[in-house]
Regions:
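Charged, low-complexity surface patches
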Residues: 85, 107-108
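An acidic- and aromatic-residue-enriched active-site/binding cleft used to recognize and process polar
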Residues: 108-114
Length: 208
């Protein structure tokens, strides 16, 4: 497939209009993409599989790195599921404190750190610490912005990407102390609400 696309690229390399290049390349890839899409089975994890729902984590020295993948589709973790999204993060950070007390910092590299409704979850220090990633990797941290809440292609962001020649939402690496992030979350999401959600989430599979 790549050889065929390479031949098309060479054919149109001098052309200012990329329409033919794009269409002919898509014609090559489309049968493979369509077959894969038709076979795809929606991922519906349970709490046993993803105990922190849309959040996951890994560790490096005294830092817990947090990662995001929307398991609430077609709902959004930043609107309909916002309290549940925050409650799961609180639980992740509380468990981190209990299980790995040597970990004192939280970090995340994601395009979501360029989205105001996501940044509201975190303290001002987190927002101010943002550093743009130097390397573009094949991860949701960069490319997740081209997927909408249903898991389909985000056409508006795709169009902006073409117009700008850059990511609409740059992937930023942000960090703050674990305790500061927890304090901010508890203040923004009152404890009674969070406690009810945490109790409920420990029992109910995500697809329920």
């Amino acid at each position: 497939l790549l050889k065929k696309v390479e031949q098309i690229f060479v054919e149109y390399i001098q052309s200012d209009d990329t329409s033919a290049l794009e269409q002919k390349s898509l014609d090559i890839f489309w049968p493979v993409l369509e077959e894969s899409a038709l076979k795809a089975i929606p991922y519906r994890p349970t709490l046993d599989e993803r105990p922190y729902e849309s959040w996951s984590r890994d560790y490096h020295e005294d830092v817990v790195n947090i990662h995001i993948n929307n398991v609430y589709k077609p709902d959004s973790p930043l609107s309909e599921k916002r309290p549940q999204f925050a409650a799961a993060l609180i639980r992740l950070l509380e468990d981190t404190q209990e299980l790995t007390p040597e970990v004192t910092k939280v970090a995340c590299g994601s395009w979501l750190n360029s989205v105001p409704t996501f940044l509201e979850i975190f303290p001002d220090v987190w927002k101010a610490s943002g550093q743009r990633s130097k390397n573009v990797r094949y991860t949701l941290g960069h490319w997740g912005q081209f997927m909408d809440r249903r898991g389909d292609f985000h056409a508006r962001n795709g169009s902006r990407f073409r117009e700008m020649g850059d990511f609409p939402y740059p992937s930023l690496h942000c960090t703050d102390s674990l305790e500061a992030v927890l304090c901010h979350l508890r203040e923004k999401f009152p404890e009674p609400i969070v406690k009810r959600l945490q109790t409920k989430l420990r029992r109910i599979p995500l697809e329920s």
